[in-house]
Amino acid sequence: MDVIHLFLATLLVSLCFLTAYSHLSPEEKPKDDRSLRNNSSMNLLDSPSVSIMALNKKSKKISRKEAEKKKRSSKKKASMTKVARPRLLQPAPCVATRDSCKPPAPACCDPCASCQCRFFRSACSCRVLTRTC
């Protein structure tokens, strides 16, 4: 009985390996050592070299000072460019054309417009029916 279980387990593992290997795309399949060496040498020549340098404390301080100067200068420019804004006028107690005018809202601003409601008074808007009133 143990031999049968061992055989079935081996068969199951081999089938799992076969299905996983057959579903790999061609570029994911393992290659031989020669092709790997050729690809790695070509990749090294194609990519640009990158050098990483550590910053010392002095250069960090200089960059922080430069950043603070930039912040200060931008704040000064922003404060100089501020212009007195005109006061916003209170909106008139009316609804502009094509805006919502549901019943508790005031009347339409345009004398030729009227409030039209659709879909059981759920969507209402001010519309101009005729240009000549």
UniProtKB/Swiss-Prot annotation:
Lineage top rank: taxon: Eukaryota
One GO term describing the cellular component: extracellular space
UniProt feature, compositional bias: Polar residues: 37-50
SMART domains hit by this protein: Agouti (SM00792)
Signal peptide (UniProt feature, chain positions): 1-22
A GO term for molecular function: melanocortin receptor binding
Compartment annotation: Secreted
Entry keyword Signal: yes
Region feature (Disordered): 26-83
GO biological-process terms attached to the record: hormone-mediated signaling pathway; melanin biosynthetic process; melanosome organization
Domain (Agouti) ranges: 94-133
Glycosylation sites: N38, N39
Biased composition, class Basic and acidic residues, residue ranges: 26-36
Pfam families in UniProt: Agouti
InterPro entries cross-referenced by the UniProt entry: Agouti, Agouti_dom, Agouti_dom_sf
Keyword annotations: Disulfide bond, Glycoprotein, Knottin, Secreted, Signal
Biased composition (Basic residues): 70-79
PROSITE patterns for this protein: AGOUTI_1, AGOUTI_2
Annotated domain remarks: The presence of a 'disulfide through disulfide knot' structurally defines this protein as a knottin.
UniProt name for this protein: Agouti-signaling protein
Lineage of origin: Eukaryota, Metazoa, Chordata, Craniata, Vertebrata
